[in-house]
């Protein structure tokens, strides 16, 4: 028998110390990684609940194990809320991650060797959209589209590639593209060549849920997303679709038993909470502020002479090219880290450096917006970053910025009383 009083602090001091240090880091550092956010205490509570004890292979009402009557309720709540949130007819809440959701889509609708047309990783796409190092680039014939000299997707070029290569599936989505995707145009191109349209909205799902970014569900054959990032839930995946019995059956089979075994019902419960939070009016205000904050930061960088890829942002993220300054993303990342500002190095178009070094930084505002930053704080923050980038080896500047970061983080904590 377990005692409910046996906490991690009492049982495993070493692990507890590391967890406490991470909690302190999150409170004292400014988080600007575009794919990161902070979950609510309710989301974390669900993930640490008794639901972690239950195996539930199958789907609600059709399980391979007994004793699933209550986890069926949990999973159905998550399904129903996801469908309501995104206006979908179908939702599968079982994928353990976004990459696994994407793999399940490919497994459901493609055969090995089929051609897919996705956005190049070097131009802002994602590993799972056909990158050579990913299974999506190894199992399928991956053709890649990119951005033009203005940093924008050239839809005429996408159409030309589609007509030339006749893909079985067109993938629309990104990990580092700051503009609005034209879903009707993608649909038009897919229809022209008889391809499935698959949209990976992992980065913008929260914006979509709040109505501040176009919803791909009415246009795509299938949509995937993560449930963290802008959606601000647990780490996990989600698949959505319009009504299509054949596609729904294939997707369900591809997730289980095709790609996964038992679902993580404690994480699915956390997803249900996340979807409920996203259905509240205040979530729309939060997402609107996320975009305003990203735009405010980008404007400061442009005014200070830095190159923002695509000339600005219309979502939660943007790429900063440091080619002109001859600064590597790796060095910039390290210098900002000393000042308690967390970013990630990122390749930029026509990057002369390797993906392990890069010539750019990716910025995102979901996390700072969660802790209460508005345009004024984000402009000030962008200015501090510019000061460091202007002289990476100036320890006095880094020290001064770090003190400012600690002060603003104390003023705007992640988790209040």
UniProtKB/Swiss-Prot annotation:
Gene3D superfamilies: Aspartate Aminotransferase, domain 1, Type I PLP-dependent aspartate aminotransferase-like (Major domain). The keyword Ribosomal protein does not apply. It comes from the Bacteria. Pathway: One-carbon metabolism; tetrahydrofolate interconversion; Amino-acid biosynthesis; glycine biosynthesis; glycine from L-serine: step 1/1. One of its GO terms (molecular function) is glycine hydroxymethyltransferase activity. The modification N6-(pyridoxal phosphate)lysine is found at residue 229. Keywords: Amino-acid biosynthesis, Cytoplasm, One-carbon metabolism, Pyridoxal phosphate, Transferase. Its cofactor is pyridoxal 5'-phosphate. One of its GO terms (cellular component) is cytosol. Its main location: cytoplasm. Its EC number is 2.1.2.1. It is found in: Cytoplasm. The record marks 228 as: Plays an important role in substrate specificity. It catalyses: (6R)-5,10-methylene-5,6,7,8-tetrahydrofolate + glycine + H2O = (6S)-5,6,7,8-tetrahydrofolate + L-serine. It holds the Pfam family SHMT. (6S)-5,6,7,8-tetrahydrofolate binds at residues 121, 125-127, 354-356. GO terms for biological process: glycine biosynthetic process from serine; tetrahydrofolate interconversion. Homodimer. Belongs to the SHMT family. Catalyzes the reversible interconversion of serine and glycine with tetrahydrofolate (THF) serving as the one-carbon carrier. This reaction serves as the major source of one-carbon groups required for the biosynthesis of purines, thymidylate, methionine, and other important biomolecules. Also exhibits THF-independent aldolase activity toward beta-hydroxyamino acids, producing glycine and aldehydes, via a retro-aldol mechanism. This is Serine hydroxymethyltransferase 1. It comes from Pseudomonas fluorescens (strain ATCC BAA-477 / NRRL B-23932 / Pf-5). The gene is glyA1.
């Amino acid at each position: 028998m377990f005692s409910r009083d046996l906490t991690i602090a009492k049982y495993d001091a070493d692990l507890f110390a590391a967890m406490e240090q991470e909690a302190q880091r999150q409170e004292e550092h400014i988080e600007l990684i575009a794919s990161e956010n902070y979950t609510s205490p309710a989301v974390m509570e669900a993930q640490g609940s008794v639901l972690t004890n239950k195996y539930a292979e199958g789907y609600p009402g059709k399980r391979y194990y007994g004793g699933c009557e209550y986890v069926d309720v949990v999973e159905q709540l998550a399904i129903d809320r996801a469908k309501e949130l995104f206006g979908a007819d179908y939702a599968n809440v079982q994928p353990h991650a976004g990459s696994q959701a994407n793999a399940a889509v490919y497994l459901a609708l493609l055969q090995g060797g089929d051609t897919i047309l996705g956005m190049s990783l070097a131009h802002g796409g994602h590993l799972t959209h056909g990158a050579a190092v990913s299974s999506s680039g190894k199992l399928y014939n991956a053709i890649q589209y990119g951005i033009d000299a203005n940093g924008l997707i050239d839809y005429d070029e996408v159409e030309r590639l589609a007509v030339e290569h006749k893909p079985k599936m067109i993938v629309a989505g990104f990990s580092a593209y700051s503009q609005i995707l034209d879903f009707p145009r993608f649909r038009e191109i897919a229809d022209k060549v008889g391809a499935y349209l698959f949209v990976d909205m992992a980065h913008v799902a929260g914006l979509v849920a709040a109505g501040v970014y176009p919803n791909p569900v009415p246009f795509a054959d299938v949509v995937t997303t993560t449930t963290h990032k802008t959606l601000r839930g647990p780490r996990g995946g989600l698949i959505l679709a319009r009504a299509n019995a054949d596609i729904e059956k294939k997707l369900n089979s591809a997730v289980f038993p095709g790609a996964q075994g038992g679902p993580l019902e404690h994480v699915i419960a956390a997803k249900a909470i996340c979807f409920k939070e996203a259905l509240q009016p205040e979530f729309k205000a939060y997402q609107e502020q996320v975009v305003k904050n990203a735009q405010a930061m980008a404007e400061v960088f442009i005014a200070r002479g830095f190159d923002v890829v695509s000339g600005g942002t219309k979502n939660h993220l943007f790429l900063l090219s440091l080619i002109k300054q001859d600064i590597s993303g790796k060095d910039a990342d390290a210098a900002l880290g000393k000042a308690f500002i967390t970013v990630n190095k990122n390749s930029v178009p026509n990057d002369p450096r390797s993906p392990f070094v890069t010539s750019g930084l990716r910025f995102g505002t979901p996390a700072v917006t969660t802790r209460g930053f508005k345009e004024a704080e984000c402009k000030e923050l962008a200015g501090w970053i510019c000061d460091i980038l202007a002289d990476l080896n100036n320890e006095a500047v880094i020290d001064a910025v770090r003190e400012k970061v600690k002060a603003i983080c104390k003023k705007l904590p992640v988790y209040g009383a």
